[in-house]
Amino acid sequence: MADNFNFELVSPERLLLSEMVTEVVIPATEGEMTVMAHHAPTMTTIKPGVVSVRSASGKKQDYVVFGGFADILPTGCTLLAESAVPVEELHKDELTRRIEAARKELEDTELHEHKSKLEHFIMELTHLRGVVQQD
């Protein structure tokens, strides 16, 4: 049986989850990471994606996050999301609205570095929209 650890998912609006879990899969910017008890201390940035949580009771919960940071310690993990919502509460048009807003910002920007970041962000959101709509 896997050991449990404390996981917290926090957005500026609210604390979405704080409970003992067996594993959490997070969309780190360098690739998906599975976090379990006794994980090596790590700090990572989060890209838009789905956070999958397996609670100590075995229940699986998914959340959509739109970037942030994760602080991982052997005894727990805290994910500070720029924005987050349970998958079942995500409105279908929310991702489309965010993609369109990023495209509008892309049209209005002059800086090459900012354009590159926006193009990458649009790609991540488009991929996320495909993943969420398949579930």
Swiss-Prot record:
HAMAP family given for it? ATP_synth_epsil_bac
Q: What topology does the record note for this protein and the membrane?
A: Peripheral membrane protein
Q: Which UniProt keywords apply?
A: ATP synthesis, Cell inner membrane, Cell membrane, CF(1), Hydrogen ion transport, Ion transport, Membrane, Transport
Family designation: Belongs to the ATPase epsilon chain family.
Quaternary structure?
Answer: F-type ATPases have 2 components, CF(1) - the catalytic core - and CF(0) - the membrane proton channel. CF(1) has five subunits: alpha(3), beta(3), gamma(1), delta(1), epsilon(1). CF(0) has three main subunits: a, b and c.
Family matches, as PANTHER family: ATP SYNTHASE DELTA/EPSILON CHAIN, ATP SYNTHASE EPSILON CHAIN, CHLOROPLASTIC
Which Gene Ontology MF annotations are present?
Answer: ATP binding; proton-transporting ATP synthase activity, rotational mechanism
Recorded hits in CDD domains, A to Z, give: F1-ATPase_delta
NCBIfam families recorded = ATP_synt_epsi (TIGR01216), PRK00571.2-4 (NF001851)
Q: Which GO terms describe its cellular component?
A: plasma membrane; proton-transporting ATP synthase complex
The protein's name is ATP synthase epsilon chain
Classify the source by domain of life.
Answer: Bacteria
Which cell locations does it reside in? Cell inner membrane
Say what the protein does: Produces ATP from ADP in the presence of a proton gradient across the membrane.
Pfam entry (one):
ATP-synt_DE_N
